[in-house]
């Protein structure tokens, strides 16, 4: 029975109706209000689960405008609470640092920001201080997919902008 349960892969994901994500529209409005960017894109990934706990990843990317160069600047949130300390060992920063920005035609240190929000019934913090999110495989995968989607949108914007400047 134990072997059969471990091999079974058709378990349904937990219900995500108990989660309260920010939403794509308020996230986009907030980014526009505080950073006045030339480009902004947001995505809300479909609900997923780790260890039986549902979670939703929301992410936004913004470029130009009032954003200082030296990017990417990362803003992390978990259940609507900003994670201000110990960002170096967070799963979000790991995903951002592992991204090959050259693939998306982003060279140097351009002015852009990444805002990530993890909404879950149980955030897997590394420490009792709730300062950073542990790198769980399922959460890392959803963060990576969200960042890849947004990076493609930013790359498309930069290509169109470059063509317009050449003309």
Which positions does each model-derived feature cover?
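GHKL/Bergerat-fold ATPase module in large chromosome/replication-associated machines
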Residues: 1-108
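Charged regulatory segments coupled to nucleotide-binding catalytic modules in large multidomain enzymes
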Residues: 62-167
């Amino acid at each position: 029975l134990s072997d059969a349960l471990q091999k079974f892969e058709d378990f349904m994901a937990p219900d995500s109706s108990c989660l309260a994500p920010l939403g794509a529209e308020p996230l986009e409005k907030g980014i526009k209000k505080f950073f006045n960017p030339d480009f902004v894109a947001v995505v809300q990934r479909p609900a997923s689960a780790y260890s039986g706990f549902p979670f939703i990843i929301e992410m936004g990317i913004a470029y130009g405008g009032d954003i200082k160069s030296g990017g990417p600047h990362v803003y992390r949130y978990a259940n609507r609470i900003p994670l201000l300390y110990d960002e170096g060992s967070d799963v979000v920063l790991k995903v951002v640092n592992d991204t090959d920005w050259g693939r998306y035609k982003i060279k140097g240190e351009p002015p852009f920001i990444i805002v990530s929000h993890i909404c879950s019934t149980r955030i897997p913090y590394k420490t009792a201080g709730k300062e950073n999110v542990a790198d769980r495989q399922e959460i890392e995968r959803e963060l990576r997919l969200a960042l890849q989607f947004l990076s493609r949108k930013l790359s498309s914007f930069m290509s169109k902008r470059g063509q317009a400047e050449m003309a």
